[in-house]
A protein has these predicted regions:
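A short, polar beta-strand/turn micro-motif
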Residues: 1-50, 71-139, 144-180
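A broadly used, surface-exposed interaction patch
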Residues: 49-57
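Short linear interaction motifs
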Residues: 63-71
Length: 180
């Protein structure tokens, strides 16, 4: 049982017959990032499946200053340790508590990719310069050093900064070429 706001440290991999992660998800149509250490089979709110209420997209690649995502065709395509973006398909106000359910091998660390996630809070100095997704889902902008918001919470994903000069932002291309 994993809960938002708490780090997850797993020194060795293991197999879980049932795993859950609970957090408040936006229901205003805004995009957010997520990474989980298990394969997801359902999203529930108040005990009712709401997986059909969400669009979930997986990272495809980065080309120049464009980050490309492809929509999952089925929630069971959601794989452990891979970072995703998701949004509720309505324009209501606020949040709803969501429980992500699944099972499988729980790895010690998330998959390492340009778009990656973390199971522990990444603090200001280490987060600075990495890129966070805006709520509109249109771009990744750099986290500024020495600001309270320059953190990456556990179970969130980010675009890693490069070693050389980095662009001011990356645009997002959603499934089928639609730009957020």
């Amino acid at each position: 049982v994993l809960t938002d706001g708490h780090d997850f440290v797993c020194p060795t991999s293991f197999t879980a017959t049932k795993a859950t992660y609970t957090r408040n998800c936006y229901i205003d149509g805004g995009w957010e990032t997520i990474v989980l250490p298990f394969n997801v089979t359902d999203i529930k709110s108040g005990g009712t499946s709401v997986k059909g209420d969400y669009t979930v997209e997986g990272y495809t690649n980065t080309s120049g200053t464009t980050v490309k995502f492809t929509e999952l065709t089925n929630i069971t395509d959601w794989k452990a340790d891979n970072a995703y973006i998701l949004k509720h398909n309505s324009v209501e106000t606020g949040t709803q508590e969501c429980t992500f359910e699944g099972a499988g091998t729980i790895a010690a660390t998330p998959a390492d990719a340009d778009f990656t996630g973390t199971y522990t809070l990444i603090s200001n100095d280490l987060a600075a310069g990495n890129y966070a997704l805006n709520a509109a889902g249109t771009e990744f902008g750099p986290l500024a050093a020495s600001t309270e918001t320059a953190v990456i919470p556990a179970f969130r994903a980010y675009l890693k900064k490069g070693n050389g000069p980095n662009p001011a932002k990356y645009s997002v291309e959603h499934d089928n070429g639609a730009t957020g």
